[in-house]
Amino acid sequence: MKRMIALDGAQGEGGGQILRAALSLSMITGQPFTITSIRAGRAKPGLLRQHLTAVKAAAEICRATVEGAELGSQRLVFRPGAVRGGEYRFAIGSAGSCTLVLQTVLPALWFADGPSRVEVSGGTDNPSAPPADFIRRVLEPLLAKIGIHQQTTLLRHGFYPAGGGVVATEVSPVASFNTLQLGERGNIVQMRGEVLLAGVPRHVAEREIATLAGSFSLHEQNIHNLPRDQGPGNTVSLEVESENITERFFVVGEKRVSAEVVAAQLVKEVKRYLASPAAVGEYLADQLVLPMALAGAGEFTVAHPSCHLLTNIAVVERFLPVRFGLIETDGVTRVSIE
């Protein structure tokens, strides 16, 4: 019998990232875990619908036995079984992030006995989670370089707080892992601005694009009007394509916040990324830790290691026989497998 790993949910960023990472790693390694003080660092501690959906999805895919899987629970025991490929559908029942649920279960399906398709309904444009276009246009091309083949499709948008969106991913078992080397960003090839609107006047998007264009030379400016019943909602994105990597940044519009202020938040974030020679942005860095650890080698550079990144590394090192090294050099932090 494999030993039970004990995790403190209050460590590091103190949110749902510890739980999601532990679920992924438990499914992959077969190691059971107990986590206490779940989301202790949040205003509403314990499992929310999105986290509970991730737990139930993980349990279904690997036939796990679970204790504490209920709303508000701050303690969970997860004993995994064998991961099974197949077709799965999960509903969050709120505007909780579809992509964070997918992020939890897809790594285990890289080791399944056959191809899989996972469909999740809930929120797709959430201010605290990566949108589907980030997964599709930024993360998945990098995963393909590592040898991981999955394809995400956004079937319907669902903005916060209404939800109602649908995202699906098709994924195949991994034959072998390759090493990812992302030390240099390279020169910028082009930048693309994009605005999504649902039930929001078009002039909002035009003002947001104008704000982006006032700070950057945009090769493309796209405004997409979605059906009104998918809103109300508004998301502004800016994609930076460089020689070695494509990064994508986004901001979700809010009621009573002007278009100019929303877009200015995005401008600030992109300028912060471009001010450093690091290849990888803060949010992408979190998501490269697990696939890099599974490959057993690789490196990337990031401007500053976030609390999420350090938390992810700490959890990975509890489940896998790997050690990460973080070295500050030339104004960046180089993250690698030691």
Curated annotation (Swiss-Prot):
Subcellular localization: Cytoplasm
InterPro entries tied to this protein: RNA3'-term_phos_cycl_insert, RNA3'_phos_cyclase_dom, RNA3'_phos_cyclase_dom_sf, RNA3'_term_phos_cyc, RNA3'_term_phos_cyc_type_1, RNA3'_term_phos_cycl-like_CS, RNA3'P_cycl/enolpyr_Trfase_a/b, RPTC_insert
EC number of this enzyme: 6.5.1.4
TM annotation in the entry: none
UniProt-annotated binding residues for ATP: 103, 283-287
Predominant location: cytoplasm
Signal peptide: none
Domain of life where this protein originates: Bacteria
Catalytic residues, chain numbering: 308
Assigned GO CC terms: cytoplasm
Keywords recorded for this protein, A-Z: ATP-binding, Cytoplasm, Ligase, Nucleotide-binding
Pfam family name, one: RTC
Catalytic activity line of the entry: a 3'-end 3'-phospho-ribonucleotide-RNA + ATP = a 3'-end 2',3'-cyclophospho-ribonucleotide-RNA + AMP + diphosphate
Gene Ontology MF annotations: ATP binding; RNA-3'-phosphate cyclase activity
Gene Ontology biological process terms, A to Z: RNA processing
Enzyme class per UniProt: ligase
The family this protein is said to belong to: Belongs to the RNA 3'-terminal cyclase family. Type 1 subfamily.
Functional note: Catalyzes the conversion of 3'-phosphate to a 2',3'-cyclic phosphodiester at the end of RNA. The mechanism of action of the enzyme occurs in 3 steps: (A) adenylation of the enzyme by ATP; (B) transfer of adenylate to an RNA-N3'P to produce RNA-N3'PP5'A; (C) and attack of the adjacent 2'-hydroxyl on the 3'-phosphorus in the diester linkage to produce the cyclic end product. The biological role of this enzyme is unknown but it is likely to function in some aspects of cellular RNA processing.
Protein name as annotated: RNA 3'-terminal phosphate cyclase
